[in-house]
Amino acid sequence: IAVLRLFGFNVYRSTYKPLLAESVVEFWNRFYYYFKELLVTFFLLPTFAGPGRKLRRWPRLRLFVAVFAAACIGNMYYHLIRLSAPLAQGDVLESILAQRSRLFYCVLLAVGIFVSMLREQRRQGQPAAAGGARRLLRIFGVWTFFATIWIWGVRGGAPFVARTEFFLGLLGLA
């Protein structure tokens, strides 16, 4: 992309206007581009091509397993490694339990990306329905999805149960 731009072509970078993304996958591709590329290279592609071969009869399940490996397991792996002190002391289980909220965030992210990918496939390459109101609704949906799952993704001292009660309170269920 950089070389094309040097030659005068007005090509957008892959991170162009992430807040105007109309799907979860599009936002993930734009906002977390380099992190996403690492997850795709080290988790999604090896899972899809390796163990995923046994799931050829079930393409949706194969895609889900590969997306789950990248967006959940790979993402969680990154966040566990950031807790180097407890891991160095051998407290692996404690490190995982300390990241319960992040694990739930990763599960929701993986499911959201998978559903978004299925919607993109269902459209079969055709553009999304036109209209300013529909476009705004799709953008609002992406923002709402990420704002909602960020309840569990943000770092802080709130335990998993408190975050879940907060979310349920937003819905009037707690």
Model-identified regions with their sequence ranges:
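Membrane-embedded transmembrane alpha-helical bundles that form the catalytic cores
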Residues: 1-174
